[in-house]
């Protein structure tokens, strides 16, 4: 898929910009499944740096507000947080949606905004799973958590008319996952807000 080609490009750029730092395709591909693997019996049981916070509020005028932090481990990776814009190269690089995250080096992000439609973030949901079950899900093609929002928003950004907020809630409530998480999201209209607990 396209994400594989993008990972190859990121590996190449790391080699050009930081030749003393070895970064491989396999290393970055492992990060694509960080969230899923961190929920397994192979990971530390420590809950340190595994929490994030999302806040949804509505102003008196009905405007929705969505803010979030990113307390995910490892702490040092926060130093590579970027504001990223996903663009369609065939339409004069028109931005489709954007995000702020350090997961950019996986070609996905865990916090995204599609203007006029939705803002969304994932938050850690505690659970320990068998690594065998998670690896079976990965081999079966379950979408990595870090691509859930990207793949939806790529499709939605091309729709005319765009998908509704309620349809986004339904889609993300039913997307097959290999590991649990919370989805915190707000829409563009008054009252459009949801927190989805996924197992």
Specify the residue positions occupied by each region the protein language model found.
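C-terminal catalytic or substrate-handling cores of phosphate/nucleotide-
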Residues: 175-199
């Amino acid at each position: 898929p396209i994400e594989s080609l993008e990972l190859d490009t990121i590996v190449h750029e790391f080699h050009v910009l930081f030749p003393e730092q070895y970064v491989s395709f396999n290393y970055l591909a492992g990060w694509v499944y960080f969230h899923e693997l961190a929920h397994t019996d192979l990971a530390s049981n420590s809950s340190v740096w595994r929490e994030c916070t999302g806040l949804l509020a509505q102003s008196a005028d009905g405007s929705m507000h969505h803010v979030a932090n990113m307390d995910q481990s490892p702490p040092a990776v926060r130093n590579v947080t970027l504001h990223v814009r996903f663009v369609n190269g065939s339409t004069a690089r028109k931005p489709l949606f954007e995000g702020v995250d350090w997961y950019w080096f996986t070609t996905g992000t865990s916090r995204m905004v599609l203007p006029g439609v939705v803002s969304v973030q994932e938050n850690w949901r505690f659970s320990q799973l068998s690594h065998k079950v998670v690896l079976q899900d990965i081999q079966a093609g379950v979408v990595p958590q870090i691509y859930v929002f990207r793949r939806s928003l790529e499709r939605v950004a091309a729709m005319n008319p765009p998908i509704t907020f309620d349809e986004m809630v339904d889609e993300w409530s039913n997307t097959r996952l290999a590991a649990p998480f919370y989805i915190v999201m707000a829409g563009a209209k008054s009252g459009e807000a949801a927190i989805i607990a996924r197992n």
